[in-house]
Amino acid sequence: GLSFVCILLVINSIFISCSKDEDKPGSTGLNLFSIEDDKKLGQQLDQEISANPQQYPILDPSQFAQSYEHLARITNTLLNTGKLRHRDDFVWQYKIIRDDEVLNAFCAPGGYMYVYTGLIKFLDKESELAGVMGHEIAHADLRHSTETMTRDYGLQTLLEIVLGGNSGTVTTIAANLAKLKYSRRNETEADEASVAYLCNTVYD
């Protein structure tokens, strides 16, 4: 997730000049998980989040169609830049969490994204929200989530979850997912990738 200060830094990074390097942004970290593992872990966490409306009150897309269409427009623009490594590998779905007091967004492995209403209402421009969304998309695409969770919870624990076990730990991880602390390197890579996604789009 993003702290208030990080949100401002990400928004500011939108105005950095676009790089001429057309290569897809990549992570320099070591990740022992497969792409399928990322997707399975993300799916289990998403199911846990959806089953916990007290902590994560998800807006119903059928009742808040305009809000979801707004996110769809931004997300599709970023996903279709040709600069993601796992554009066709991951799920890339998004849910809106009703909490006007929280200025945050976060992303689970495999492209499961969550945005708080507080953040959407706080940001004045669509380009600002696009910058934050790009940052979270980058965390998933560069596979920072499983890299960081491996550091925090251990490889064996995450593999048990992928294989369908350790339900108690799934609950714990899901409850703390919005507070996941990425390394400084991960945050820098996500910032740079977000800027790369935004270049040559309507948000440039």
Set out the residue ranges of the language-model regions.
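Post-HEXXH active-site segment of zinc metalloproteases
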Residues: 145-175
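C-terminal motif of bacterial Sec signal peptides marking the signal peptidase cleavage site
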Residues: 13-17
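N-terminal leader-region detector that preferentially activates on the first domain or presequence
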Residues: 8-9
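Metalloprotease/metallohydrolase-associated module, dominated by Zn2+-dependent proteases
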Residues: 36-39, 166-204
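Bacterial N-terminal signal peptides that target proteins for export
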Residues: 1-5
